[in-house]
Design a protein with these regions (language model features):
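Acidic/histidine-rich catalytic neighborhood of metal-dependent amide-processing enzymes
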Residues: 86, 95-136
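N-terminal capping segment at the start of a domain
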Residues: 2-33
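Catalytic-core environment of secreted peptidases
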Residues: 50, 62-93, 101
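A non-catalytic alpha/beta surface segment that caps or lines the substrate-entry region
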Residues: 22-67
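General beta-strand structural signal in soluble alpha/beta enzymes
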Residues: 54-58, 79-81, 121-123
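General structural feature for long, well-ordered alpha-helical segments within catalytic domains
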Residues: 5-12, 35, 39-43, 75, ...
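Short glycine-enriched loops at secondary-structure junctions
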Residues: 9, 68-69, 83, 125-128
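Active-site nucleophile and cofactor-binding loops and adjacent substrate-binding regions
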Residues: 56-57, 90-96
């Protein structure tokens, strides 16, 4: 049985949660803001450190992709959520889905598991819809 590193996951959630935190303890990473970019840069770095291919599309969706040998033509399994926030957001909103997916992929890789298809982790842009419509 595989078990993710809960402490590692929570440390990343707290680290990302500090991005966009103001002096009053309010967390804000509006899409396309400097805080959103800082959060995306951080998650992108973690994806890269995990050995994933990191891609950002034209509207800012961030993807970390694991393509094991021999399955490049298979449709990927997509996991993820978003890391942008509304004003005064909760710490776990959205980022839990992205960071938990990253932790799962890292656990699978370390265990030696080789999936039959690529696995992509998405951090979708403007999920909260505060910058432009439609959202996500």
């Amino acid at each position: 049985m595989l078990i993710i590193n809960e402490e590692h996951l929570l440390k990343r959630i707290h680290t990302l949660g500090a991005v966009g935190l103001d002096a009053d303890g309010r967390r804000t990473r509006l899409a396309a803001s400097d805080e959103d970019k800082a959060g995306r840069d951080l998650v992108s770095r973690w994806m890269s450190e995990a050995g994933l291919t990191v891609v950002t599309d034209y509207i800012g969706n961030l993807f970390g992709i694991w393509v094991p040998e021999g399955c490049a033509d298979a449709a990927p399994l997509m996991l993820g959520s978003h890391i942008d926030t509304v004003i005064n957001a909760g710490q776990f909103d959205g980022c839990y889905g992205v960071l938990a997916a990253l932790e799962v992929v890292e656990t699978l890789k370390v265990s030696g598991f080789v999936p039959a298809r690529p696995i992509a982790i998405g951090a979708f842009a403007n999920e909260e819809g505060v910058r432009y419509a439609p959202d996500m």
